[in-house]
Amino acid sequence: MKKLILGTLLCLSVTIFAQSGNSMASILQKIKSQSKIDTQDKTVYDLMDEFYQKNLQADNDEMTPEFTHKLQKAVSDSNTKNIHLLYLFLMYQQHISQAVAEGKKPNPVFQIETMNLLESETKEVYGKLPAIIYIFKAEALDSGSKKEEAQMTVASGLKEYPDSIPLKVYSYLNTKDENLRKDLTQNHPNHWMVQQFGIK
């Protein structure tokens, strides 16, 4: 029953936020009150990292039915620790996917607030951030016309993850650094982001 309630909350959160102006912080508190927090359990961290590896770092989308099943299993398992982090992550992802599917621009206020919460909650639980949070936060800030903060987020992410292709792409787009351009075109010419942004 708890999972049904949380699942419903997850599905409706974007609509609730947009219609009533409820803050993500209040939604998070409802979700977090049902979550078992365990700083030693890396399941959710590993899922976010695997999502990043398969969806963003790989040359092409390598999402597999096995990974999708693993993700769905974690969401539906009442014993999943730190599930509030996974819910925040999926709320953000759902919001972006829904906006793209409807041909609309994502809500930057929702994006930024969700990513700020996910960043602080993930740091609180794990003491560090997976690369995907730096990427999503930079995208959120960029969509909210906070270009300088987005650039600082990308720079911070690259310090932690110097081999991250998406972070290198965003850094190059911000700085036009010739060394980054060479690295991307020589070492990652087939990466979907290099091709999407026409980096040559």
Please name every model-derived segment.
Residues 25-106, 126-140, 165-171:
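Amphipathic alpha-helical repeat scaffolds of TPR domains
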Residues 61, 104, 108-111, 147, ...:
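TPR-repeat structural position
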Residues 67, 111-114, 150, 184:
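Single-residue signature of alpha-solenoid repeat helices
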Residues 69-72, 119, 155, 189:
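Alpha-solenoid helical repeat scaffolds
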Residues 128, 170-200:
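Terminal, low-structured helical/coil segments at or just beyond the last alpha-helical repeat
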